Regions:
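Gly/Ser/Thr-rich loops at beta-strand to alpha-helix junctions
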Residues: 1, 53, 82-90, 220-225, ...
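Generic helix-packing signal
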Residues: 30, 34, 97-100, 229, ...
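Glycine-rich phosphate/pyrophosphate-binding loop at beta-loop-alpha junctions
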Residues: 1-27, 79-171
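Active-site-adjacent helical/loop segments in soluble small-molecule enzymes
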Residues: 31, 35-77, 155-230
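Conserved small/polar residues in nucleotide/adenosyl-binding loops
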Residues: 2-7, 232-241
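Alpha-helix C-terminal capping segments
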Residues: 68-70, 92-102, 227-231
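Generic beta-sheet signal
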Residues: 78-80, 234-235
Length: 242
């Protein structure tokens, strides 16, 4: 929106750099800078997206806050459907669950850039090049290389640093990798993950339906999350934690 654009352009302490590419290209630059500790220290550079562990720590807090608001007993479980492209916010949900928060399901909601949905359905992780990343009506999720996914995969692989480095280094550069059925079953059963994707038409239909039923105007990213709940056939009482 125009307001959102002005927030990122008009303040005198902001300097914008334009890249000819997609989100993944921008994130590659941030990762390269973050990987050079001496350069970062010399120029006092930090990142405020979910590459920075501090952001995930803050996001963990609002999973706990949300759980406290909707539950009545200490053992009551809640499921979260999270619109995601970079696997950041939902990675915080995974961390909260590992810390002991009673989370039943974590639903990965993607748009047409469905690399993550494909993984949780099939075990195949195939990051796409920038040229194949689609521009959609939920643009914050127009990402084909999820930087935080490696953090979850580390847990899924038994915290095997060498195997994780091999998969997300050599294998991803070669086009991706596949995990066996047992690992995907563990993602669902041990870590609570489900996934779903939606199209532009799905988002429009969901926004219309929610507005007519609840008099609430959902944004397109929220619509992706709502659609994913329907897609995974999660029962309504589970989303309320009952």
């Amino acid at each position: 929106s125009d307001v959102y654009k002005r927030q990122g352009l008009d303040d005198p302490n902001i300097f914008n750099i334009a890249l000819d590419g997609v989100f993944d290209d921008c994130q590659d630059v941030v990762k390269a800078v973050s990987g050079d500790a001496d350069f970062k220290a010399a120029y006092r550079i930090g990142a405020v997206n979910s590459i920075n562990w501090a952001r995930l720590m803050a996001q963990v807090v609002y999973y706990i806050s949300c759980w406290l608001k909707v539950t009545e007993t200490a053992d009551q479980k809640v499921s979260f459907s999270v619109p995601t492209g970079n696997f950041g916010d939902i990675c915080a949900g995974h961390i909260a669950r590992q810390m002991g928060l009673p989370i039943d399901r974590l639903i990965v909601a993607t748009n047409e850039n469905d690399v993550l949905d494909e993984f949780f359905r099939t075990g195949n992780y195939r990051p796409r090049p920038a040229a194949e990343t689609m521009a959609t009506s939920s643009p914050s999720m127009d990402i084909s290389r999820a930087s935080n996914f490696e953090r979850f995969a580390f847990d899924l692989l038994g915290r095997d640093a060498a195997e994780t480095a091999e998969l997300f280094g050599t294998k991803v550069k070669e086009g991706g990798f596949s995990l066996d059925h047992d690992k995907i079953a563990a993602a669902r059963e041990d870590y609570g993950f489900l996934s779903g994707s939606s199209s532009h038409a799905d988002r429009l239909a969901t926004i219309k339906d929610v507005h007519e039923r609840f008099d609430y105007l959902a944004d397109p990213h929220t619509a992706d999350g709502i659609k994913a709940v329907s897609y995974t056939h999660l029962r309504a009482h589970e989303t309320r934690g009952n």
